[in-house]
């Protein structure tokens, strides 16, 4: 309920601020409501469609093999560990899968707490100790228990709405300015206007990515804390330390990467979906 209230309040705030700014700039606000509805439909529509098909998409893009019947003791232990942690966290047992990759990584995805998937790479499953893997699994189960998939989808929907709305409002201001200084009053013209909107979509999109990445980093710290409760602080730290010593992870689709245990490094930390492993380890030790 709080999450939905925050969502509505944020969108109302966007509309209010935009209306005030448009009034100050002398822009006709009679169509602002329609534009916001348009932006929200496409902004949230894309985010929620992505969430709804997240499990299916993960299985297809990552080549995940869901474990229905364990083939060996390692797979049996993996399923039993996830089942135990899910019970501790009070959620329905997620599907458990393995995807073939030499990297040390894992991720959680799914539209809800009771309809989720936890997947680990073959490199992680056969390259880390059971204590380290237990820490990784606890982190992913915590993502599911915390409702992070839905939370970040709502945040993504808000920023998508902002990007679509703001880009077209600013393009409208530019068009009106050009029109007022044009003897024929024609403005930018359709193709030039579309070009301006495209550039603004890109610029605002970068800002939006930074906002989503910021909230993603916060959720990573929370998932680490939850992982420490489910497995133990020592196992969680051991898992992160092992990841820190390993090679940088390879490419993973953005939606899965946001809930992976190990994110890609970036020159600018503000663009990273995961905090640096050193900071995560330090936060756990200080807790």
Swiss-Prot record:
Membrane association type: Multi-pass membrane protein
GO biological process terms on file: proteolysis
Keyword Transmembrane helix attributed: yes
GO cellular component term of the entry, any: plasma membrane
Residues spanning the membrane: 4-24, 33-53, 154-174, 195-215
Family statement drawn from the similarity comment of this UniProt entry: Belongs to the peptidase M48B family.
PANTHER family: PROTEASE HTPX
HAMAP family: Pept_M48_protease_HtpX
Record localization: Cell inner membrane
Cofactor(s) this protein cannot do without: Zn(2+)
Keyword Transmembrane: yes
Protein keywords: Cell inner membrane, Cell membrane, Hydrolase, Membrane, Metal-binding, Metalloprotease, Protease, Transmembrane, Transmembrane helix, Zinc
Domain of life: Bacteria
Cofactor comment text: Binds 1 zinc ion per subunit.
Protein name per UniProt: Protease HtpX
UniProt xrefs under Pfam families: Peptidase_M48
EC number: 3.4.24.-
Single GO molecular function: metalloendopeptidase activity
């Amino acid at each position: 309920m709080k999450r939905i209230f925050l969502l509505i309040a944020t969108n109302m705030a966007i509309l209010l601020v935009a209306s005030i700014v448009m009034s100050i700039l002398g822009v006709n606000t009679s169509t602002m409501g329609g534009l916001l509805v348009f932006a929200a439909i496409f902004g949230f529509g894309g985010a929620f469609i992505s969430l709804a098909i997240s499990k299916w998409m993960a299985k297809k893009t990552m080549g995940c093999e869901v474990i229905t019947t364990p083939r060996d003791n390692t797979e049996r232990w993996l399923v039993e560990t996830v089942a135990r942690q899910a019970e501790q966290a009070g959620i329905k047992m997620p599907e458990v899968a393995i995807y073939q990759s030499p990297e040390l990584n894992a991720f959680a995805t799914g539209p809800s707490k009771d309809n989720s998937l936890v997947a680990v790479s073959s490199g992680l499953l056969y390259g880390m100790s059971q204590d380290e893997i237990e820490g990784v699994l606890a982190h992913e189960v915590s993502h599911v228990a915390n409702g992070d998939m839905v939370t970040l989808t709502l945040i993504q929907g808000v920023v998508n709405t902002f990007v679509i709305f703001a880009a077209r409002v600013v393009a409208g201001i530019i068009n009106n300015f050009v029109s007022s200084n044009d003897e024929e009053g024609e403005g930018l013209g359709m193709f030039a206007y579309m070009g301006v909107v495209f550039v603004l979509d890109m610029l605002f999109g970068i800002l939006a990515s930074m906002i989503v990445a910021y909230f993603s980093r916060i959720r990573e710290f929370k998932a680490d804390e939850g992982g420490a409760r489910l497995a133990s602080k020592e196992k969680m730290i051991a898992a992160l330390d092992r990841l820190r010593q390993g090679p940088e992870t390879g490419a993973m689709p953005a939606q899965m990467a946001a809930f992976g245990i190990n994110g890609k490094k970036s020159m600018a930390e503000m663009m990273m979906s995961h905090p640096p492993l050193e900071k995560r380890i330090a936060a756990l030790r200080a807790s």
